[in-house]
Amino acid sequence: NVTVFSDSVVAKVNGYKRVKSVEIMSSSTKKIVIIPCDLVGHSGGWNPTVHLHSQARGSLRYVLNLATFIPDKSIQKSLCIGAASGKLTLGEALYSGLEVSKQALKEIGLKEIHTEAPNSTLEKYSIEPLWQVGVSKKFGKSFLDIQNDVTTDDVDLAILEGYSNVEHVKRYTTGGMGIDQGKTGNINIIGTIALRQGLNLEEVGTTTFRSPFSPISFGSIGGLREGSVVLPYRHTPITKWNLDKGAFMYEAGARWRRPGYFPMMDEGFQDA
């Protein structure tokens, strides 16, 4: 059986070097229940992957009932559909795909295809933001960015020092500068900045989204493909010639490869 604690928060995680237990606190009665465990999972709701839209200089807007930022206006010729546009249920995503495809066809001068979105079960998505668990200092640190161990105290100190702009907070605290580039923690930091300054999240805004997200052609991932699939290599005009001549290719960084040597017959590296 799985016990569900409603109207409650994880107030503290106990353990040294590893998790040993959590303290769950009722939001209304403040009663504490301790549960032995070795792992704590957490969820921040659904956050659309808006990185490519942002890199294309597109703007974002905050949607209160989704508690997240979604694409607003596009500058370049890009269209967002489905979950990437804030349509988080299956029915919404399917309908979004249909409508945006019609728009795309129109923009490139093709006739609209008359079809209907597939039927799907009616779903509802709801979320209530909780930017910080309202507990006393005795419970220790409250982490916002799990990647870089950024806490609410770090954000408070940044604002106290006059770094209240979201770009300044990012650099003062290193929030959102881990290998996930803010994918897991940025919305928490923005929400906390807003809470501290009495602003809404749209007034706080976002930082510029960067890699690890980069465009990739559908041809790279569609259908049968030999060789690298997860991270396809880039090619120069002479790449095919090198491969045809039997070159042993070395990685050269940024998804490029260069010929290391051209073996003849059964030659190894030293012989070649």
Q: Model-flagged regions — what are they?
A:
Residues 1-233:
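Residues forming the flavin
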Residues 231-272:
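N- or domain-start disorder-to-order transition segments that initiate the globular core
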